[in-house]
C-alpha cells in the first residue's frame, strides 16, 4: 500500500471477500485474534446469515477500529491509520516511509519467484515517491539480468522475471511539491521504465479517472506477469483533491485548478456512463448510496464504542506489546513437507568439512593456546548457523555482495 493506504486496504480486502468461498471467509474471521473482531460485528449484518455481507462489515470495522487505536482493530490498535495490514486477505504491511511499499512488495515478489509460488504482487505509491532511493532501487533489483538469465528454469520451462507491478498513483503532488515541472525530472512517471530494462518495464500511462481503462491496463499487466515477463510499471494519472493532511491549506495551488478537477469527478462520471449505457438505473445507485451510509454509520458507532472497542490498557497489562511482538515459538521451517533445494549434502560442503577439523576449544591437550587458524571462530559459528538453516528451511534465500565469491568482509559466507 501507499503512504496512506486506506483505499487500497479496502479495495484489496473487498477483492479477497469476493474471491474466497464462505467457509474460508468464516474460518479466517473466526480464527483471527480468537474471533475478537468477528464477535463485534456478527449478528449485526444487514442480511442475516450472509457471509459476504458479514465479511464486509468485518473488513470495515477491523480497519476503522485500527484507525481509532482500538484493540479490536486488525493490529490491535498499534498500527493506526498508516500501518494497518491484514495478511489473511493479502493486505501486506504498510509503513510511514514514503515509497516504502516498493521494497516490501519487491521482497514478496522475490519470495514468489524463488519459491515457485503462484500469483503477482502490486506495489502502490505516489509520483512524489519516485525520487526516493527505495523505489528506484526496487525498480533496478526487480529487473536484474540474472533473474531471467542465470536463475534457471521453473516448472513451466521458462526463466520468469519477478511477478511485480509497480503501480504509481500519479496525482501531481508529493506533499506540496508538484512533481511535473517542479520537483522531479521525468515529466511523466512512465518514462522511468526506460531506465531499468530493455522492455522499459512495459511502462504505460493510464487515465486513472476511467475505471475501465485502469481495469484493462491492470489486466494486461497481470497477464504478462503471469507469463513471466515482469516487472511492469503503470503510471496511473489521477488527482489529489484533498490536502496532504488536515493542516494542509493547499496554498501551493489555485482554487481554479481544484474546481476543474472536481468537475471531472470520476465517481460521478462513471455513474453517469453506466446510467446512459443502461447498465444500472439512478434508483439503483441511490439505493447503493443509502446502504453505504447505513453500513458506515453502524461501523463508525461500533468503532468508537469504548465497551465494544476498548483501547489497550498498558497500565493494567504492561507486557501486552511484548506478547504481540514476540511469538515465543520456534518454527524450523516456513514450509512444512518441502525439501530444501541444495547443490549437495551438507556434509559434502567444503567449508563444513574444514570446520570439522577445527577445535571448538581454545587450548590443546597440554593447555597451550591454539593458533587462530586451528580454532572455531565467530565467523565460523555464524556460517554454521546460517548453512544449517538453509538445509532446514526451503524458503530461505541469500543475496547480495556478501554472498558472492569473496564471502564478505569477514568471510562469514565463504563456502
Segments predicted by a language model, with ranges:
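Structural motif
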Residues: 120-124, 165-167, 233-235, 397-399
Amino acid at each position: 500500500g501507499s503512504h496512506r493506504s486506506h483505499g487500497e486496504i479496502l479495495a484489496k480486502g473487498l477483492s479477497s471477500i469476493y474471491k474466497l468461498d464462505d467457509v474460508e471467509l468464516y474460518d479466517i474471521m473466526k480464527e483471527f485474534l480468537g474471533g475478537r473482531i468477528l464477535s463485534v460485528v456478527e449478528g449485526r449484518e444487514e442480511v442475516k446469515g450472509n457471509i459476504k455481507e458479514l465479511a464486509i462489515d468485518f473488513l470495515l470495522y477491523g480497519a476503522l477500529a485500527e484507525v481509532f487505536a482500538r484493540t479490536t482493530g486488525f493490529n490491535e490498535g498499534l498500527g493506526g491509520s498508516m500501518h494497518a495490514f491484514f495478511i489473511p486477505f493479502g493486505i501486506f504491511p504498510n509503513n510511514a516511509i514514503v515509497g516504502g511499499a516498493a521494497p516490501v512488495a519487491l521482497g514478496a515478489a522475490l519470495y514468489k519467484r524463488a519459491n515457485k509460488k503462484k500469483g503477482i504482487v502490486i506495489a502502490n505509491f505516489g509520483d512524489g515517491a519516485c525520487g526516493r532511493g527505495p523505489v528506484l532501487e526496487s525498480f533496478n533489483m526487480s529487473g536484474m539480468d540474472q533473474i531471467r538469465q542465470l536463475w534457471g528454469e521453473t516448472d513451466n520451462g521458462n526463466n520468469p522475471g519477478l511477478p511485480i507491478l509497480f503501480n504509481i498513483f500519479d496525482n501531481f503532488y508529493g506533499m506540496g511539491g508538484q512533481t511535473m515541472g517542479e520537483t522531479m525530472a521525468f515529466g511523466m512517471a512512465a518514462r522511468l521504465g526506460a531506465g531499468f530494462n530493455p522492455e522499459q518495464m512495459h511502462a504505460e500511462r493510464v487515465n486513472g479517472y476511467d475505471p475501465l481503462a485502469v481495469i484493462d491496463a491492470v489486466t494486461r499487466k497481470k497477464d504478462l506477469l503471469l507469463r513471466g515477463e515482469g516487472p511492469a510499471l503503470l503510471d496511473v494519472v489521477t488527482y489529489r483533491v484533498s490536502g496532504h493532511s488536515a493542516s494542509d491549506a493547499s496554498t501551493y495551488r489555485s482554487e481554479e485548478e481544484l474546481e476543474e478537477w472536481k468537475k471531472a469527478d470520476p465517481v460521478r462520471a462513471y455513474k453517469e456512463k453506466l446510467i446512459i449505457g443502461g447498465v444500472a438505473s439512478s434508483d439503483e445507485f441511490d439505493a447503493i448510496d443509502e446502504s453505504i451510509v447505513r453500513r458506515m454509520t453502524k461501523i463508525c458507532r461500533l468503532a468508537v464504542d469504548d465497551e465494544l472497542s476498548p483501547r489497550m490498557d498498558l497500565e493494567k497489562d504492561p507486557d501486552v506489546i511484548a506478547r504481540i511482538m514476540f511469538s515465543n515459538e520456534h518454527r524450523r521451517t516456513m514450509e512444512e513437507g518441502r525439501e530444501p533445494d541444495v547443490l549437495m549434502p551438507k556434509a559434502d560442503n567444503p567449508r563444513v568439512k574444514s570446520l570439522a577439523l577445527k577445535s571448538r576449544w581454545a587450548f590443546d591437550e597440554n593447555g597451550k593456546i591454539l593458533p587462530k587458524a586451528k580454532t572455531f571462530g565467530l565467523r565460523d559459528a555464524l556460517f554454521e548457523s546460517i548453512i544449517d538453516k538453509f538445509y532446514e528451511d526451503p524458503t530461505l534465500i541469500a543475496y547480495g555482495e556478501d554472498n558472492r565469491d569473496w564471502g564478505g568482509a569477514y568471510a562469514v559466507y565463504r563456502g
